């Protein structure tokens, strides 16, 4: 239990760093803060996988209900509150926001913003839902994750535990290549908003989840040492901070 608390403490520290980085980015203080989104995606993929393994028998219904309560319901609530506040301003009409609001509630806002030529990095962006592209990708991932998890787990349990890890690693490589290719051939926003170019982060998290559950028990004892753990963890944090400080969206 103590190890589990320490484990989640490390994850909470990473989350806190990512949240602060995003905030500082939007305050024009940290130019690479937008990279924290990748960190959130990795954590989402990882935690989804680890949580699914905790269920003796994975339930699709239970998973979807959980995601509706934790992700979709709060998002929908914020959306309707935003629309209520917007309605108080006479120069802003609901009908102008209807297509965008629909895309938010149906989970395809990232593609809507892409089609509408929205620029996330434009400081004058006026949409109240400019940041909801991230939630759209999470919703799309949550829609397919149960199927991916069940298939990969069956392959791992029936044949070899390495198979899910290898498959997710291949998917990470494919998505990374797609990310790189589209960044060269397309507008940067096509790469930024596109679900397929973001899958590398999510599948990397899923891969780590399978590695954790299948191979966590055979990690050498020296790596489980609390001092070694802290050194690795804080080295990772330092690497993140360097990326957040020195990376800009054109790189």
Predicted features, each with a name:
Residues 7, 17-251:
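Hydrophobic membrane-embedded alpha-helices
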Residues 9-12:
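Short, Arg/Lys-rich segments that mark the N-terminal edge of DNA/RNA- and chromatin-recognition modules
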Residues 1-7:
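Short, Lys/Arg-rich, polar N-terminal cytosolic tail immediately upstream
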């Amino acid at each position: 239990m103590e190890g589990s608390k320490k484990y989640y403490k490390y994850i909470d520290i990473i989350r806190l760093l990512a949240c602060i980085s995003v905030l500082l980015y939007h305050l024009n203080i940290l130019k690479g803060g937008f990279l924290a989104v990748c960190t959130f995606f990795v954590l989402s993929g990882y935690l989804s996988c680890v949580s699914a393994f905790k269920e003796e028998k994975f339930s699709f219904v239970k998973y979807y209900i959980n995601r509706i309560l934790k992700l979709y319901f709060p998002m929908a609530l914020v959306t309707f509150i935003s629309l209520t506040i917007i309605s108080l301003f006479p120069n802003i009409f609901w009908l102008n926001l209807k297509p965008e609001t629909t895309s938010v509630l149906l989970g395809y806002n990232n593609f809507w913003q892409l089609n509408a030529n929205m620029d996330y990095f434009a400081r004058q962006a006026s949409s109240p839902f400019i940041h909801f592209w991230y939630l759209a990708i999470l919703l799309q991932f949550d829609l397919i994750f149960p199927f991916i998890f069940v298939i990969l787990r069956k392959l791992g349990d029936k044949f070899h535990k390495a198979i899910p890890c290898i498959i997710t690693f291949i998917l990470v490589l494919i998505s990374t290549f797609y990310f790189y290719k589209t960044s060269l051939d397309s507008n940067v926003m096509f790469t930024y908003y596109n679900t397929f170019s973001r899958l590398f982060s999510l599948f990397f998290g899923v891969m780590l989840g399978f590695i954790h559950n299948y191979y966590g028990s055979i990690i050498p004892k020296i790596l489980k040492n609390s001092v070694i753990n802290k050194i690795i963890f804080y080295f990772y944090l330092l690497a993140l901070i360097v990326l957040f400080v020195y990376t800009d969206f054109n790189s």
